[in-house]
Amino acid sequence: MKQGVVVDMVVLGEPLVEFSADRALSEAGTFHLSFSGDALNASVTAAAQGARVALVTRVGADEFGARLIRFAAERGVDTRWMARDEGSTGAYAVGADPSGERAFAYFRHGSAASRMGPEDVDRSPVADARVVLLGGITAAISDSCAQAVRHAAKTASGRVVYDPNFRSRLTTPEAAAAVLRDVAPHAALVKISAPGDSGALLGLTEPHEIARACLDLGAGSVAVTLGEGGVLLAEGDATPVRVPAFPAAEVVDQTGAGDSFAGTLAAWLARGESLTAAVRAGTAAASISLGGRGGTGRVATRDQVEAVLG
């Protein structure tokens, strides 16, 4: 970390250009351009919660890369560690059929962000941030990125939050489970969704069993996210507690809801809030995010989250 650099939290991952359509991709003729990706969604949400957050990544030395940096900066994200790279900026297209079922097409193979490695961690504030948010998607996009995630978990002196965020298009259950096993002993919190992530990586779907398995891997605490069922929060040997979900006032698109949860949770931890308060804030932010289209279509502010919390 360079002298004089002060951040509350760091997010490591790949931002993406988003092309969204209001109909199936096979029929779409017009797309809306925006920016998303789990790392960007979480970073923008954390900034909206008042955290000083840095996004560590690489974007292409192209116009989309420049626009991504500008988009993040305009939303309060510290972009000094968004390096320009000769690889292309990753992108995806998303459309929906009449029933609302979404379909995605990704264009990220060999992207600038996939060229990240441990050296990107070493040039960043990871070692000094209060909270470092890491994800399984980042680890899945290349071997060097998986090395970067593992290195960041070991390098961080603050609290590591890890979201396995399993994607079968990017990796295998075995490879994703291996990253979880390596990162969990360094994680203050593992956030894992059930049954999606837990079934693939742990072979478990019962929330208490999932929490126990992650604690046994070495995680300090575990947040098992259950959609409308809320969150099961487990810390050490204490009795797990259920944190209820907040009903969404409007459901437009579920894209990025989990990222909103993770980014808000990490931001509240970085500002010194308790884990339970941070999880409640994350559930509130996720419910608000459902009202917007795309990963960054509706980003909850701290005032909005506090209004939901009451």
What are the residue ranges of the model-derived segments?
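Glycine-rich phosphate/adenosyl-contacting loop at the front of the ribokinase-like
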Residues: M1-D78, E250-V251
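Conserved phosphate-binding/catalytic region of the ribokinase-like
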Residues: K2-V10, G203-G310
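Ribokinase/PfkB-type carbohydrate-kinase core domain
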Residues: K2-V11, A73, T79, P98-P240, ...
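Short, glycine/acidic-enriched loop or turn micro-motifs at the edges of active sites
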Residues: V17, A21, A61, F166-S168, ...
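Alpha-helical segments flanking ligand/cofactor-binding loops in enzyme cores
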Residues: V44, I69-R70, R181, R212, ...
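Hydrophobic residues at beta-strand termini and immediately following loops
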Residues: V56, M82, V243-P244
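Acidic, glycine-rich active-site loops and adjacent beta-strand->loop/helix elements
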Residues: R58-F64, G87, G110-A112, F166
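A glycine-rich helix N-cap at a beta->alpha junction
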Residues: R70-T89, D97
